[in-house]
Amino acid sequence: NNYCKIKCRSGIHTLCKYGTSTKPNCGRSVVKASGLTKAEKLEILKQHNEFRQKVARGLETRGNPGPQPPAKSMNTLVWNDELAQIAQVWASQCKYGHDNCRNTAKYLVGQNIAEQSTTAASFEPVSNMVKMWSDEVKDYQYGSSKNKLNDVGHYTQMVWAKTKEIGCGNIKYIENGWHHHYLVCNYGPAGNIGNEPIYEKK
């Protein structure tokens, strides 16, 4: 397993630790679905690119304060199956949180995660979860050192101009009567790097 050779700041690579199988490892929870449908993949990609374009064009009015300035340039994201597999293996462990090491031979990999739980007899759609990330823009001040990653880090990764690829995984399971939907998206190259701006202002 070549993933065991990939170096990260801490920990063992997710695919070295758990292998390449995306089989759910959720203890006594009842797994209802593991892995995104084609429609869910397309929805995630569409939502990301539409939002990136909105911000890049200077059409995002929200912020602290808004509006967000237009961007000089911003890549259009494409789906990457390797990033998606790493995300799916992690999601399949049913452990909410970031994994330690998910880089590929090509680049450092960033990550957004979301979990929605409901007592209703259905699972939250992926679109609601991605919207939670983009809605963090309301707390973001462009170019300020006061932004806290805990509050806006999902938004900043979503619109990180230099990121080119995305791949996601998910799991839907029932535990103690609650319907949990856990979504993991991996991004390459990673955003939220040091003091770099999320994008260059136009």
UniProtKB/Swiss-Prot annotation:
Residues modified to Phosphotyrosine: Y107
**Keyword entries, A-Z:** Allergen, Disulfide bond, Glycation, Glycoprotein, Phosphoprotein, Secreted
**Which residues bear sugar attachments?**
K138
Q: In which tissues is it expressed?
A: Expressed by the venom gland.
Give yes or no: UniProt keyword RNA-binding: no
Cystine connections: C4-C16, C8-C101, C26-C94, C168-C185
Q: Name one Pfam family in it.
A: CAP
Query: What's the family?
Result: Belongs to the CRISP family.
Q: What is this protein called?
A: Venom allergen 5
Give the originating organism.
Answer: Vespa velutina
Q: What is the lineage of its organism?
A: Eukaryota, Metazoa, Ecdysozoa, Arthropoda, Hexapoda
